[in-house]
Amino acid sequence: MKSKRFFLIFFLITAITEAIIVSLNYYFDYYGVFHTDETVVKSNTLNDRFVKVKRVLNNSVSLGCTSFLWGSSRVLKMDTKITGENTYNLGAPAGMTEDCIEQINIFINNGIKIDTVYIGLDDCSYYRDYSAISNNLSWISYKDELNRDIETYSCYLLMPSNVKRVIEEKGKLQGINYLGENGMFSVPYQIEENIEKNVVKYVKDPQFLVPTIYNKNPIEFERCLDNLREISEICKKHKIKMKIFFNPQHMTTYLADDMELMNRFKKELVKISSFWDFSGVNYVTANNYFWYETSHPRAFICDKILDTVSGQNKITWVPDFGVYVTPDNVDAFCEKAVRDREAYDPDHEQWIPTAEERAIMIKRVNYPW
């Protein structure tokens, strides 16, 4: 009798504990997967791969998107209104070409019309092992398959650590995710405000001396190119325009990168499609003012990239930024990149824009709307 009573009490305590954990996880929704109908979400931990795809599928008529942007956290801040099309930002932390293939097929299979795909690439596109990303619960994809998606929901509901994280991170700066508009992530305004308070001090921050380095997986190099070939074939089959661009790298990171491998990748990439390249030595990559750290350019720079790639060219204040690489100029382009890097002086004086110049840049107002 005592043992039965013990097990009954144990079972009840366990059940109540699990019920509390499930309820709290659903309520706090650390990864945003249970409240995808919200149009604006404040979160730094949103699972973009899951939430955005579900959002597009469930709201394809109201969103009316016929154009989509894929890429890593470097494209998350891009305001897709700039494209002049109804474009949805499907960028995700460590977003890779595998995400694009999976999601574009889901959309096509669900009858969503696609006119244009924008694909943002960077060094992590051909460095990082996607299996480590796809197995990370923070980044797991929406599969549009009932059994697999229910399994994901269950994992999120039953994780006590999520409740702990919500408590620990309460009060921290939260970015705004415009899920109901265009999927863009907006950096907390305090971050931009703090930069502008003392620009002279900011550009001398020691963080800009530390390169961003990824673990290299040699398999991913060919895998990334194979993925892009497959995406290109999908686009040709369904009469979709494909626009590829290579994101800028802060010079500290660029100097630490494998130049030979990067140029080899670009020479293979151009066989698949011509592309815009914003990396290399230029006005933006060489000046700390345009960066949050040595990995992510500031939001208004992200907008300029998309403005150029989409062909709108409404943002005109950024000089010497972006080269259109084709099979005809790729060899000369790569050779010049090597020469420019060898000639670059990392100790050059940092350019600091005037207050008037900064006012034009950071307002993000030179748009066609």
Predicted regions located by residue number:
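Hydrophobic membrane-insertion alpha-helices, especially the h-region
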Residues: L8-Y26
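Short extracytoplasmic
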Residues: S43-L69
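N-terminal post-signal-peptidase region of extra-cytosolic proteins
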Residues: R49-V56, T97-N105, D226
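Secreted/periplasmic serine-hydrolase-like ester/acetyl group-modifying domain
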Residues: L121, Y130-K236, F321-W369
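C-terminal regions of proteins
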Residues: D258, N263-W369
